[in-house]
Amino acid sequence: MNKTFLLSLCCLMLLSCTSAQNNGVPVFPSKSLEVNTSIVTGAERMDLYLPLLKGKKAGIVANQTSQISGVHLVDTLLHQGVLIQKVFAPEHGFRGEAGAGEHIKDGKDAKTGLPLISLYGKNKKPSSDMLKGLDIVVFDIQDVGARFYTYISTMHYVMEACAEAKIPVLILDRPNPNGFYIDGPVLNLEFQSFVGMHPIPVVHGCTVGELAGMI
């Protein structure tokens, strides 16, 4: 308390002296402070995570929102020499071409030739066979901050399955466009389902990375 009071007193004295030297008119900086408001997503921080993927056989959980400056994450990682073995597809599919609630089938990506493993059909949690041969799994999907969006449920099951298989999961975080807003009741776990797995409000205010740290 004494230190705070002393600091406040010194600031007041300094302001008084400055004002007196300028005929009672305080002097303020002529240029306003510039604040950098650009947002850098986790996927863009390749300098930090590419070393973690070097020489590793990787599985990618992604969809059409997994972009780096307009280029898909999978295309970017392949260009960087990452050994992607397979892609796990959430609701709406890897390329975002399926409707809401439409089951996704296993297949092959037409552009890259990579195997596509559905996580929105008969299997919502990766099996041990699906994870076999992988050294790491990368999750990168844009979320909107609503509890009923199934991407966070997919992330939950991916983390759970990888923990059981002792495979690390890398979450590439993205901003929550509704991160400033929290609303709605907390889920009663008696009604837990794939469209509501966690005891959080309907509009929860968290990023996928923040939720991953709490799961």
Regions picked out by a protein language model, each given a short descriptive name:
Residues 1-32:
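Bacterial Sec-dependent N-terminal signal peptides
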Residues 38-83:
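N-terminal phosphate-binding or glycine-rich loops at protein starts, especially the Walker A/P-loop
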Residues 82, 164-168:
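A short helix->loop->beta-strand "cap" motif at the edges of active sites that frequently abuts
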Residues 85-93, 172:
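Short internal beta-strands
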Residues 96-101, 170-192:
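Glycine-rich, charge-decorated loop segments at or immediately adjacent to ligand/cofactor-binding or catalytic sites
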Residues 104-134, 146:
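Glycine-rich oxoanion-binding loops at beta->alpha junctions
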Residues 143-155:
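Glycine/threonine-rich flexible loop motifs
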Residues 192-215:
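Conserved anion/nucleotide-ligand pocket segment
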